[in-house]
């Protein structure tokens, strides 16, 4: 029997690596697909409840009008800034991956650091937005609202899980689902961004210590980049379906 016939295929365990990629990147794709299905379920549920309560469902352009250190009426400007920041961090991640392909350690460190900063700014911005959404931004903690069909001044308690100031029916019964979905969807996505920042910090540390130089490749950067781009892409859908529509 020839030596060629005895040769085993190079790859992992049972055969040649499928799709011409490493098992690490393949499993990352599996994870991202399953995670995408979770976000899809949340956004579909949001659409269902929005349709069911369309008569009292708040208009996001009238809800998210705040901006730090000002009292101006700026619909979605702050959320737009958050979106721009996250997209910009995706660009810096692309540059970090490209530097990894060139085995440019300094380039990887620079662009990963900027990606970390961008992600941290987004998380901090979301914390501020949550605080305003929960506690309210009106002076005196009072707000005009409809109670039993009559406009009157009522205590202002913010839009928390037990009370939704923005969705009040003509019977005075509040519909808290807007706040429920706001905390659930943005919180779940925010957790992903926070996790990504932590992973990016770990990656930066590994690059600084020369781990990838010793390995001879920067594939880890590519896998982290896939996750970060996924998080950015999901936010585009969240921004569109929750804030714009």
What kind of region is each of these model predictions?
Residues 1-245:
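...captures the hydrophobic TM-helix bundle architecture rather than a specific catalytic motif
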């Amino acid at each position: 029997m020839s030596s060629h016939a005895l040769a085993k295929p190079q790859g992992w365990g049972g055969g040649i690596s499928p799709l011409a990629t490493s098992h690490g990147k393949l499993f990352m794709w599996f994870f991202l697909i399953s995670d995408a299905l979770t976000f899809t379920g949340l956004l579909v549920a949001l659409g269902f409840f929005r349709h069911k309560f369309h008569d009292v469902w708040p208009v996001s352009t009238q809800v998210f009008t705040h901006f730090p250190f000002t009292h101006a009426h700026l619909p979605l400007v702050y959320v737009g800034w958050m979106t721009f920041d996250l997209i910009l961090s995706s660009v810096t991640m692309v540059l970090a991956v490209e530097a990894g392909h060139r085995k440019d350690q300094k380039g990887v460190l620079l662009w990963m650091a900027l990606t970390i900063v961008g992600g941290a700014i987004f998380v901090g911005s979301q914390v501020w937005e949550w605080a305003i959404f929960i506690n309210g931004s009106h002076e005196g903690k009072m707000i005009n609202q409809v109670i039993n069909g009559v406009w009157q001044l009522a205590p202002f308690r913010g839009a928390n899980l037990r009370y939704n100031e923005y969705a009040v029916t003509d019977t005075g019964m509040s519909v808290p689902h807007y706040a429920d979905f706001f905390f659930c969807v943005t919180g779940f996505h925010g957790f992903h961004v926070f996790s990504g920042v932590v992973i990016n910090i770990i990656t930066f540390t590994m690059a600084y210590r020369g781990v990838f130089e010793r390995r001879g490749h920067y594939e880890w950067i590519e896998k982290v980049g896939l996750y970060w781009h996924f998080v950015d892409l999901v936010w585009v859908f969240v921004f569109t379906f929750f804030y714009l529509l």
